[in-house]
Amino acid sequence: MPVISKASSTTTNSSIPSCSRIGGQLCVWPGLRQLCLRKSLLYGVMWLLSMPLKTLRGARKTLKITHFCSISNMPSSLKIELVPCSKDNYAYLLHDEDTGTVGVVDPSEAAPVIEALSRKNWNLTYILNTHHHDDHIGGNAELKERYGAKVIGSAVDKDRIPGIDILLKDSDKWMFAGHEVRILDTPGHTQGHISFYFPGSATIFTGDLIYSLSCGTLSEGTPEQMLSSLQKIVSLPDDTNIYCGRENTAGNLKFALSVEPKNETLQSYATRVAHLRSQGLPSIPTTVKVEKACNPFLRISSKDIRKSLSIPDSATEAEALRRIQRARDRF
């Protein structure tokens, strides 16, 4: 069985979720999307290719969290809000409507999280960290001191995540206000990287393991570790919502289109992302189904990708992944 699911020879547009308006606001939650993209595919792709590769340094101003729906298509009391933080990072507020329990995933800084909590008049119960890098834990100390929140992270990072209280490891099951959270050990970007999977809400928080159309750098891990970790994402149900650590889809699309320009599903996704970003809306969450159809790091068996990057058929999956990463870094 291959580590990454085999790329299909033909891709269709059925993988791309749509978007809908709820309560007069644009909702970007997969499964509820029915956005009418009247602009042509060519317009969307050309707009995307004309965008500069830069971070969203003004993210808190352009991506106001009040613009985001927190409506789930799952019969769950768990609601999620995106909180833009420094550069292009996202933190995520988790709110259980039944108990009032609130958590935050990967707060790179405290101020925007405090602002969001104050606006909602919420207290913070938990801080969930996927890994130890400062742009995912930078707000820990201030938030813990202010709210008395418990910090949760990998046991591997017990000496690298400030204020950590609850140590978790692969296959652990932790409860967030009655919601089962399965801990996936997902090294590659870092040795202690974990992902938080909420099966009841079809949601996973992946930090810097996987982005829409890309994956994290190998800061501490190996290609083999990254492949194994990505397989854990691929094995989840197709409708699983992926909340990654960054808003970098537009830049990732440029590379993905360059190595697989004939992928029709990717072309359709480019149009949708271009429309969302032109409206100042996030491209996240994505879904497992979309990433399997479009993400070159999950499509390392694609003949088109291998041909584009001169990767021989004899190359192992780990070697192919390494070459794709090198090509992305040079892009």
Curated annotation (Swiss-Prot):
Residues annotated as binding Fe cation: 135-136, 208
Keyword Zinc: yes
Similarity annotation: Belongs to the metallo-beta-lactamase superfamily. Glyoxalase II family.
UniProt-listed Pfam families: HAGH_C, Lactamase_B
Enzyme class (EC, first level): hydrolase
UniProt entry keywords in alphabetical sequence: Hydrolase, Iron, Metal-binding, Mitochondrion, Transit peptide, Zinc
Source taxon at top rank: Eukaryota
Primary subcellular site in the record, as a coarse category: mitochondrion
Protein name: Hydroxyacylglutathione hydrolase 1, mitochondrial
Expression sites by tissue: Mainly expressed in roots, flowers and flower buds. Also detected in leaves.
Classification lineage: Eukaryota, Viridiplantae, Streptophyta, Embryophyta, Tracheophyta
Organism: Arabidopsis thaliana
Functional note: Thiolesterase that catalyzes the hydrolysis of S-D-lactoyl-glutathione to form glutathione and D-lactic acid.
Pathway: Secondary metabolite metabolism; methylglyoxal degradation; (R)-lactate from methylglyoxal: step 2/2
Catalytic activity line of the entry: an S-(2-hydroxyacyl)glutathione + H2O = a 2-hydroxy carboxylate + glutathione + H(+)
One cellular component (GO) term of this entry: mitochondrion
Transit peptide (residue range): 1-76
Cited InterPro entries: Beta-lactamase_class-B_CS, Clx_II_MBL, Glyoxalase_II_hydrolase, HAGH_C, Hydroxyacylglutathione_Hdrlase, Metallo-B-lactamas, RibonucZ/Hydroxyglut_hydro
SMART domains assigned to the protein according to its UniProt record, in alphabetical order: Lactamase_B (SM00849)
